[in-house]
């Protein structure tokens, strides 16, 4: 019987650092080894999953990227407890159209470098259900208090967000932050080819650990989403209501509205080949002459926004992207993304001149499931490179950002990152190790070398002679080890232990080191980002 899959919930701070974009290691492998290969758009809708996965119980404890399925099965208390290993939610009485899940994350830790006590206390509730088999709903409410490691504290102070959750941070005292979280959505699915969603949530577009198109590192945002799957094609259109927090006061009264329209076409060209095309545009809610609001010109479901921009005399922030995914020998996947913020062939040919608006990025990655012929062992490696000034705009309000974080890679631009991971999962037990190495060109007060995408590119240092890592070259190294166990009890419980060592150095100008351990228990329904 198909189980009730939950909507993905947003990140705890340090507890579930090993969670994959895909639902679990087992599910990741099974997902790729079936005919279902539209894996880039997340979260998934559970009714889109192959039946062998939906019925197998693989999503137990790893539902980070599965949305509630409108067509919920009828499940009694007796059947629920008999099938406990297949699900992570409670059902009220005999009803098949209502579920209730507690949200909790209790963690404690210690930073060995700064001798600081770390903690994370989050509590909340998730309510979901369906109406007449075609309409599903979901609501998540939570609040928390956290004390962060020094580099995460720096992010919270600078970007006004709590790393992992992405929600706005409110300073309670010198080292603790409070935050509230509200998200949810309504899904209408009239048939197997079409689904429409409205709500407030996070999204991730890609097959890697990071995404150069759309990532989940920032705040949840209001959205409307249309997805259609026909033949070998899947088309996704996302309309988003974002915010700009760059006003110096930091007051909510100064937050400015901005909007985005994003499209993605996924084409299964062959059993082993998937090709994707991405396009997005961000525009400000007000300009110097008028209040624009949501521009209906961008409701056109067809992609290619540049002609629309030209017809309106607009200078909105539009970009184009491409992705390629190649699968071979069942358990091996190569994936890639290319993002083009600007593309002028004349300047591309004259690459060595270093024109400032050569704003592009590339991702190359490789995953191997059952690595070294060990079942449920995943190996992943990934490289991300983004040139200076990519994602930025002449108007900071139109930068490719939301709230205090980028919409794509958390480092913004002007960087190169190498990522590696080895993870093992078996019968509720998981252990993983990650290594992250980054080099970026740091901006300082009064300079703009292209790393801070919240700053207008009109303040750039030079038109020509720009290169990767320009500015104050900074090296970042992060190592992480995580072990966790999820109990198959009537009350879902996951115990985890995480150790992270991170160093960041800008020559002789700046050095920031952190080594900490975190331990605690949580309901494992989210993924988080603290590895940058």
What are these regions (language model features)?
Residues 1-24:
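Bacterial Sec-dependent N-terminal signal peptides
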Residues 179, 273-532:
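Exposed, low-structure sequence patches enriched in small/polar residues
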Residues 21-274, 279-285, 351-360, 367-393, ...:
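Outer-membrane beta-barrel channel domains
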